[in-house]
Amino acid sequence: MSIRIKIDKLRQIVAYFSEFSEEVSINVDSTDELMYIFAALGGSVNIWAIIPLSASVFYRGAENIVFNLPVSKVKSCLCSFHNDAIIDIEPDLENNLVKLSSYHVVSVDCNKELMPIRTDTTICLSIDQKKSYVFNFHKYEEKCCGRTVIHLEWLLGFIKCISQHQHLAIMFKDDNIIMKTPGNTDAFSREYSMTECSQELQKFSFKIAISSLNKLRGFKKRVNVFETRIVMDNDDNILGMLFSDRVQSFKINIFMAFLD
């Protein structure tokens, strides 16, 4: 079982995720024809991308597979492949490896006769495959009780001014979401109108770590605005905030849990 992927698509993925983590977990769902890429950033922050299987990302297998990919190592070695390469990614779960391979054929004029010259490249990278696991992505898309749009640069500017605090209070009033620093002295408050806000949600208040919001800084060059949802599970437990956007050719999600 392996994934065949165009090098341009692989470059996008590793360039993006290597800014946040040295490795990611890849989950291929052959039934839904989707590939999920997941990384845990710490502090109850999870990031994942959803990529449809297609001509540029093709899965050679019938069963679902989960494995780890060392994106930082992959990013460093992609210069070994031709710019038009299609790369096979094959995990070796038993030996804690992942293999990248590709070939390229060019025609060379040899005594006025075109001769095909084939170049094969194979790179084996070590990575602990025992830690890979299936992440329940659907849990965070089951229910939404609030929705707004947040301009990333403005949010980052706001939290830069309140770096002396550890968390923000999250409240809901008159179909608005309010982010506020603790206390009434030297207090900062940011308010967003919401396109969707359940009446039940406006009875609650939460806390979110500023260190979690700071992890959005890595998106600054790629994202202008995030669709932001307050998500719940099937038992109506409010889980946290889900930031979503489409980056280049794939959808990206960042989930931040509310603090207890």
From Swiss-Prot:
Paired cysteines (S-S): none
Organism superkingdom: Viruses
InterPro entries: Pox_TAP
GO biological process, one term: regulation of DNA-templated transcription
GO molecular function terms listed in the Swiss-Prot or TrEMBL record: identical protein binding
Keywords from the UniProt entry: Activator, Transcription, Transcription regulation
Signals that turn on the gene: Expressed in the intermediate phase of the viral replicative cycle.
Family of this protein: Belongs to the chordopoxvirinae VLTF-1 family.
Described function: Associates with RNA polymerase to initiate transcription from late gene promoters.
Name recorded for this polypeptide: Late transcription factor 1
Organism: Vaccinia virus (strain Western Reserve)
